[in-house]
Design a protein with these regions (language model features):
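Structural preference for solvent-exposed beta-strand-turn elements
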Residues: 1-180
């Protein structure tokens, strides 16, 4: 092995691509915060844009440019009932995570998605959200989307998911924000 000495120090700037998981959660936490949240390096992919679309339909003002997004949050209880079905597109992450938030609202919401989302298992979130006090129904009766979520005051639970899933954990943790 030969060790070579650098002739000059390494300098530069590296821009890391946006992260899908962080981008989804940034929108959600920004919407639930009081005031404006500024997010740079947001991943402008279809799944993350579905999350933005859903929160706009829940009454959250979100400005989106290529440089940043600004989310004008209204606090934990500031979401408003949507006037239409929330379409999560092809985003299972949006579907599962937003379900935890909707479970603690004082209104009913219907979530749907594309054919792929409608074939993905949602029983893994229906069970804990129901245990917490929400009414969550698979409208096709197959434990998949579309889901109708009637929010209620929630109760804290001890829950061990039978599947290892960051989405299930995040869903339950987000619902926990509304639990007594």
């Amino acid at each position: 092995m030969e060790l070579m000495q650098a002739k000059m120090p390494l300098r530069g700037e590296v821009k890391i691509p946006g992260d899908k998981s962080i981008s989804h959660r940034a929108v959600m936490f920004g919407a639930l915060a009081d005031g404006t949240t500024r997010v740079t390096n947001f991943l402008q992919g279809a799944d993350c844009l579905s999350t933005i679309s859903c929160f706009r339909k829940l009454g959250i003002d979100i400005e989106n440019t290529q440089e940043e997004i600004r989310i004008h949050g209204k606090g934990l209880h500031g979401l408003t009932a949507p006037t239409e079905i929330l379409d999560t597109g092809n985003s299972g992450t949006t579907t599962r995570l937003i379900s935890g938030i909707l479970a603690g609202q004082n209104f009913t919401t219907t979530l749907t998605g594309d054919a792929s989302v409608q074939s993905r298992p949602m029983g893994r979130i229906i069970k804990p959200l129901s245990m917490m006090g929400a009414t969550v129904e698979s409208l096709k009766g197959n434990q998949c989307a579309p889901l109708q979520i009637q929010g209620h005051p929630l109760t804290a639970i001890h829950y061990q998911s039978p599947v290892a899933s960051a989405q299930v954990k995040s869903c339950v943790l987000l619902a926990g924000l509304y639990a007594d």
